[in-house]
């Protein structure tokens, strides 16, 4: 069997983002959410269940070994800013110019797109190793934070979902670090897995 070879470093961590659980207005009610994370500087410890200092409100759908870290491509931010502007989004928790972490991600990354990334690919960083596990699916809290009703539909149609990572080797990571991608089995791309998941549910 031929061993996968290392690619050239495809990108870097633009921002590391942590969030605390807080109240989020959703229509006429309030729910708890850690969405809308904030960028932090310096090394951050990462263990099997995620980044030290980060919280999740609903552990039935967030967190766990296979969803320890959520990453989102920085390349999609202009798309979401335009989508919110065209939809006349309620600014709510977010500014017109979206800050890193606005999509709920722990890692805002450069150089990794869902259409070019496969489930099982490995991100090799100086202080840890992460494995692509599955795409993220939008929920009603994402819609509330983004400020317009079609936000989940827009994510489904665009395929700009981001991806979860499990922690293969705990350690530390920080903004500005480059990473190397080690190919996995290359059976299912992240965008393909996302379409399959969304086809099984109503958006």
What are these regions (language model features)?
Residues 1-125, 129-141, 150, 183-202:
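Electropositive, beta-rich accessory/interaction domains or terminal extensions
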């Amino acid at each position: 069997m031929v061993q996968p070879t290392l690619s050239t470093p495809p990108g870097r961590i633009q921002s590391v983002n942590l969030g605390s659980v807080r109240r989020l207005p959703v229509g006429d009610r309030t729910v708890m959410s850690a969405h809308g994370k904030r960028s932090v500087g310096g090394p951050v410890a990462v263990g099997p269940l995620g980044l030290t200092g980060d919280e999740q409100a609903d552990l039935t759908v967030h967190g766990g070994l296979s969803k320890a870290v959520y990453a989102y491509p920085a390349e999609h931010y202009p798309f979401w800013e335009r989508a919110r502007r065209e939809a006349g989004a309620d600014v709510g928790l977010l500014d017109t110019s979206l800050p890193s972490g606005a999509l709920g991600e722990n890692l805002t990354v450069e150089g990794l797109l869902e259409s070019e990334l496969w489930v099982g690919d490995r991100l090799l960083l100086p202080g840890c190793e992460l494995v692509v596990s599955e795409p993220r699916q939008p929920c009603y809290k994402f819609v509330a934070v983004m400020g317009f009703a079609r936000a989940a539909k827009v994510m489904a149609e665009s395929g700009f979902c981001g991806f979860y990572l499990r922690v293969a080797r705990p350690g530390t990571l920080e903004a500005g670090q480059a990473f190397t991608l080690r190919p996995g089995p290359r059976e299912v791309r992240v965008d393909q897995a996302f379409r399959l998941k969304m086809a099984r549910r109503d958006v």
